Amino acid sequence: MYVLNLNLEKMKRKFINFKIPDGRVDINKIKKFNKKFILIDESYNANPLSMMSAIRNMNHYNRKKNQRKLVFLSDMLELGMKSKKLHRELAPIINRSDIDKVFVFGKYIKETFNYLSRNKKGKIFKNLKEAYDHFGKIIHNNDLLMIKGSNATGLNQFSKNIKKGQINVV
């Protein structure tokens, strides 16, 4: 820092109030649906690399007693003619992970769901309202839930609605 002639105190003051933008590895303790659970909000963007990374990162979260690892995924958009193939390629990564259940919403992410192991399959939702209405039944106390998808799918707003029950940021 000294070589670059940077003032550490000034830098510290700049970063003290830094908050990760919504939908980008935003980890929250949530109290909603009469349950307490952890939400990892990755809902702002999705491409093949970020989706694979987010899925693999779920393996690094230490599982607590009676905790399930759930993911809710939506489409990766703007992939063109390779969209189905790229969505399908996520399934083996999920199948090798310690994720318990996968829930999906969207046209292309069904390709992922169709290639999942039977024990990993949660549910395909027709729309986000249906998903929101069912989440109270799906979520258990202490669950770890990651939400990941392209912003244009509306998943970011879905995540914001869940966070309205937020206790505090982890």
Question: Which role does the model predict for each range below?
Answer:
Residues M1-V170:
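ATP-dependent carboxylate-amine ligase
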